[in-house]
Amino acid sequence: MDKLKIEASEALAGNVVISGAKNAALPILMAGVLAETDFVVTNVPNLRDVNTSCELLRCLGAEVTRSDNSEVRISTSSLDHFCAPYDLVKTMRASILILGPLLARFGTADVSLPGGCAIGARPVNLHLHGLEQMGAKIEVEEGYIKARVDGRLKGAHIFMDMVSVGATENLLMAATLADGETIIENAAREPEVIDLANCLIAMGAKIEGAGTDSIRIQGVESLNGCHYRVMPDRIETGSFLIAAAVTRGKIRCVDADPSTLEAVLAKLEDAGATITTGSDWIELDMQGKRPKAVNIKTVPYPGFPTDMQAQFCLLNVLAEGTSTITETIFENRFMHVPELIRMGANMELEGNTCIIQGIERLNGAQVMATDLRASASLVIAGLVAEGTTIVDRIYHLDRGYEHIEDKFKGLGGQVVRVS
């Protein structure tokens, strides 16, 4: 099993090209099931979860081809299977997003209950309840969600009990081919939801309000394929900015979108970083400065993202002062804390809050990645730790970061993949 070996590195410097957003690419690939003609998606990152999504589409009978330049072409003319099996779904929670498109276009879907990062319950009941309101008949048996609808789904006024990105995306896709109008209230406002909606609109869908908490969809008879470019990955961008901040370096993230990172950039400025932005780049300068501690509370977009919590934990570990980080989105999302403590961090947990006293330096250690974003924080920790750090179980990392060791090397980081 691969590991990353990391040595203490100098201040990061240079440019890093940001990949397409995993959390936008996955639902957009699933939306290919809705298209009656060929569908081409570009700026698709080369990640484990993306490969799993492509394999899932092939398992359903779709023709999926991937070129070397981050382009995926999908044809559903031969799609004739409607079951997403356990062996594929167990490795990736986003597989649940195939449910809405299959049901909307073909009237039937059997989807294994999903897997993915072990960071809390994250139940699928919001997905199922919304589809039931649209006329679907759903049973959960033998580990599978079995959904059927006679004819087409029907438009509905859906009130989400809580904000859920995945449920918003699933219901949004399903509603595009439903009879009549669907309104999703308390919808997720994340940029990835907007990106999916823009893709669906390019396919012929009628959608208003994406990016607000009320999305209105007028169902259409059919959707066609299109050419669509996936948005930049805001979490990858934020992760590299954190790495530059803790190494007291200066980097520029190119092919980035600063408008999707306002809460993160504001906190980095509070920590003492100088931030400069253009339409498609972000520059961070922390040369010669130690970060200042910043308090964080994760909330749904446009607030501070839960996917940046682990990285800011690390920043605060090395910052001047005491800080608190409160996690309100997911349970069990402080599994990186014991690993950082192994490296010398001064941290303690009280319920869903982590209290951190900043220290000058970490020590290299053998640590274990527990989920996608936690693994990123451990890799960055290795860049500033004295000695050698080994990060095990980096298959988590490969689910969400494209060529991370090569990108760090390009900035001066000493990171190598070993078996």
Curated annotation (Swiss-Prot):
<keyword id="KW-0573">Peptidoglycan synthesis</keyword>
<keyword id="KW-0808">Transferase</keyword>
<feature type="binding site">
    <location>
        <position position="329"/>
    </location>
    <ligand>
        <name>UDP-N-acetyl-alpha-D-glucosamine</name>
    </ligand>
</feature>
<comment type="pathway">
    <text>Cell wall biogenesis; peptidoglycan biosynthesis.</text>
</comment>
<keyword id="KW-0132">Cell division</keyword>
<dbReference type="GO" id="GO:0051301">
    <property type="term" value="P:cell division"/>
</dbReference>
<dbReference type="GO" id="GO:0009252">
    <property type="term" value="P:peptidoglycan biosynthetic process"/>
</dbReference>
<keyword id="KW-0961">Cell wall biogenesis/degradation</keyword>
<feature type="binding site">
    <location>
        <position position="93"/>
    </location>
    <ligand>
        <name>UDP-N-acetyl-alpha-D-glucosamine</name>
    </ligand>
</feature>
<feature type="binding site">
    <location>
        <position position="307"/>
    </location>
    <ligand>
        <name>UDP-N-acetyl-alpha-D-glucosamine</name>
    </ligand>
</feature>
<keyword id="KW-0131">Cell cycle</keyword>
<dbReference type="InterPro" id="IPR036968">
    <property type="entry name" value="Enolpyruvate_Tfrase_sf"/>
</dbReference>
<comment type="similarity">
    <text>Belongs to the EPSP synthase family. MurA subfamily.</text>
</comment>
<comment type="function">
    <text>Cell wall formation. Adds enolpyruvyl to UDP-N-acetylglucosamine.</text>
</comment>
<dbReference type="GO" id="GO:0071555">
    <property type="term" value="P:cell wall organization"/>
</dbReference>
<protein>
    <recommendedName>
        <fullName>UDP-N-acetylglucosamine 1-carboxyvinyltransferase</fullName>
        <ecNumber>2.5.1.7</ecNumber>
    </recommendedName>
</protein>
<dbReference type="InterPro" id="IPR013792">
    <property type="entry name" value="RNA3'P_cycl/enolpyr_Trfase_a/b"/>
</dbReference>
<feature type="active site" description="Proton donor">
    <location>
        <position position="117"/>
    </location>
</feature>
<dbReference type="GO" id="GO:0005737">
    <property type="term" value="C:cytoplasm"/>
</dbReference>
<keyword id="KW-0963">Cytoplasm</keyword>
<feature type="binding site">
    <location>
        <begin position="22"/>
        <end position="23"/>
    </location>
    <ligand>
        <name>phosphoenolpyruvate</name>
    </ligand>
</feature>
<dbReference type="InterPro" id="IPR050068">
    <property type="entry name" value="MurA_subfamily"/>
</dbReference>
<dbReference type="GO" id="GO:0019277">
    <property type="term" value="P:UDP-N-acetylgalactosamine biosynthetic process"/>
</dbReference>
<dbReference type="Pfam" id="PF00275">
    <property type="entry name" value="EPSP_synthase"/>
</dbReference>
<keyword id="KW-0133">Cell shape</keyword>
<dbReference type="InterPro" id="IPR001986">
    <property type="entry name" value="Enolpyruvate_Tfrase_dom"/>
</dbReference>
<dbReference type="GO" id="GO:0008760">
    <property type="term" value="F:UDP-N-acetylglucosamine 1-carboxyvinyltransferase activity"/>
</dbReference>
<dbReference type="InterPro" id="IPR005750">
    <property type="entry name" value="UDP_GlcNAc_COvinyl_MurA"/>
</dbReference>
<keyword id="KW-0670">Pyruvate</keyword>
<dbReference type="GO" id="GO:0008360">
    <property type="term" value="P:regulation of cell shape"/>
</dbReference>
<feature type="modified residue" description="2-(S-cysteinyl)pyruvic acid O-phosphothioketal">
    <location>
        <position position="117"/>
    </location>
</feature>
